[in-house]
Protein backbone atom coordinates (compact mmCIF):
# COMPACT_ATOMS: atom_id res chain seq x y z
CA UNK A 1 0.00 0.00 0.00
CA UNK A 2 1.18 3.45 -0.78
CA UNK A 3 0.48 6.70 0.97
CA UNK A 4 -0.67 8.56 -2.12
CA UNK A 5 -3.50 11.01 -1.50
CA UNK A 6 -5.80 11.10 -4.52
CA UNK A 7 -8.03 13.86 -3.19
CA UNK A 8 -7.39 17.31 -4.63
CA UNK A 9 -5.78 19.74 -2.21
CA UNK A 10 -7.82 22.73 -3.36
CA UNK A 11 -11.53 23.02 -3.34
CA UNK A 12 -12.68 24.55 -6.59
CA UNK A 13 -16.19 25.86 -6.41
CA UNK A 14 -17.79 26.84 -9.63
CA UNK A 15 -19.90 29.92 -9.24
CA UNK A 16 -22.76 29.81 -11.64
CA UNK A 17 -24.30 33.16 -12.26
CA UNK A 18 -27.96 32.83 -13.09
CA UNK A 19 -29.53 35.88 -14.65
CA UNK A 20 -33.19 36.61 -14.43
CA UNK A 21 -34.96 36.33 -17.76
CA UNK A 22 -35.60 39.61 -19.51
CA UNK A 23 -39.19 40.75 -19.22
CA UNK A 24 -41.41 41.96 -22.05
CA UNK A 25 -44.57 44.04 -22.03
CA UNK A 26 -47.67 42.96 -23.91
CA UNK A 27 -49.32 46.04 -25.39
CA UNK A 28 -52.88 46.40 -26.66
CA UNK A 29 -53.07 48.73 -29.66
CA UNK A 30 -56.36 50.55 -30.17
CA UNK A 31 -58.27 50.33 -33.44
CA UNK A 32 -61.60 51.79 -34.53
CA UNK A 33 -63.16 48.54 -35.72
CA UNK A 34 -62.88 45.83 -33.07
CA UNK A 35 -65.93 45.89 -30.77
CA UNK A 36 -65.18 46.79 -27.18
CA UNK A 37 -67.01 43.72 -25.89
CA UNK A 38 -64.80 41.47 -28.00
CA UNK A 39 -61.61 43.13 -26.72
CA UNK A 40 -62.81 42.62 -23.15
CA UNK A 41 -63.57 38.95 -23.82
CA UNK A 42 -60.08 38.39 -25.28
CA UNK A 43 -58.45 40.11 -22.31
CA UNK A 44 -60.47 37.97 -19.91
CA UNK A 45 -59.71 34.75 -21.75
CA UNK A 46 -56.06 35.14 -22.68
CA UNK A 47 -54.84 37.29 -19.80
CA UNK A 48 -57.19 35.97 -17.08
CA UNK A 49 -58.51 39.39 -16.18
CA UNK A 50 -61.73 40.15 -14.39
CA UNK A 51 -64.47 42.02 -16.23
CA UNK A 52 -63.49 45.26 -14.46
CA UNK A 53 -59.76 44.86 -15.16
CA UNK A 54 -60.35 44.05 -18.82
CA UNK A 55 -62.72 47.01 -19.22
CA UNK A 56 -60.17 49.40 -17.69
CA UNK A 57 -57.40 48.15 -20.00
CA UNK A 58 -59.68 48.40 -23.04
CA UNK A 59 -60.76 51.95 -22.15
CA UNK A 60 -57.18 53.05 -21.51
CA UNK A 61 -56.12 51.73 -24.92
CA UNK A 62 -59.14 53.45 -26.48
CA UNK A 63 -58.29 56.80 -24.90
CA UNK A 64 -54.49 56.75 -25.19
CA UNK A 65 -54.00 54.60 -28.27
CA UNK A 66 -52.13 51.83 -26.43
CA UNK A 67 -52.14 50.15 -23.02
CA UNK A 68 -49.77 47.73 -21.32
CA UNK A 69 -51.73 44.56 -20.65
CA UNK A 70 -49.09 42.74 -18.62
CA UNK A 71 -45.39 41.96 -18.20
CA UNK A 72 -44.08 38.44 -18.80
CA UNK A 73 -40.97 36.58 -19.83
CA UNK A 74 -40.27 36.96 -23.55
CA UNK A 75 -41.68 33.58 -24.61
CA UNK A 76 -44.86 33.97 -22.57
CA UNK A 77 -45.39 37.56 -23.75
CA UNK A 78 -44.98 36.63 -27.41
CA UNK A 79 -47.28 33.63 -27.08
CA UNK A 80 -50.02 35.61 -25.35
CA UNK A 81 -49.77 38.50 -27.82
CA UNK A 82 -49.92 36.13 -30.79
CA UNK A 83 -52.86 34.16 -29.43
CA UNK A 84 -54.81 37.31 -28.58
CA UNK A 85 -54.11 38.86 -31.99
CA UNK A 86 -55.06 35.60 -33.72
CA UNK A 87 -58.37 35.55 -31.82
CA UNK A 88 -59.23 38.88 -33.41
CA UNK A 89 -58.07 37.80 -36.86
CA UNK A 90 -60.23 34.67 -36.62
CA UNK A 91 -63.28 36.93 -36.24
CA UNK A 92 -62.13 39.32 -38.97
CA UNK A 93 -61.06 42.13 -36.62
CA UNK A 94 -57.78 44.09 -36.82
CA UNK A 95 -57.16 43.53 -33.08
CA UNK A 96 -53.44 43.90 -32.37
CA UNK A 97 -51.26 43.03 -29.41
CA UNK A 98 -47.53 43.70 -29.59
CA UNK A 99 -44.56 43.04 -27.30
CA UNK A 100 -41.54 45.09 -26.38
CA UNK A 101 -38.74 44.70 -23.84
CA UNK A 102 -39.35 46.26 -20.47
CA UNK A 103 -36.77 48.88 -19.60
Swiss-Prot record:
Pfam families linked: ClpS
Matching InterPro entries: ClpS, ClpS_core, Ribosomal_bL12_C/ClpS-like
Gene3D superfamilies reported in the protein's UniProt record: 3.30.1390.10
Domain of life from the UniProt record: Bacteria
GO biological processes: protein catabolic process; proteolysis
Quaternary context: Binds to the N-terminal domain of the chaperone ClpA.
Job of this protein: Involved in the modulation of the specificity of the ClpAP-mediated ATP-dependent protein degradation.
Assigned protein family: Belongs to the ClpS family.
Official protein name in the record: ATP-dependent Clp protease adapter protein ClpS 1
Organism, as annotated: Rhodopseudomonas palustris (strain ATCC BAA-98 / CGA009)
Gene name in the database record: clpS1
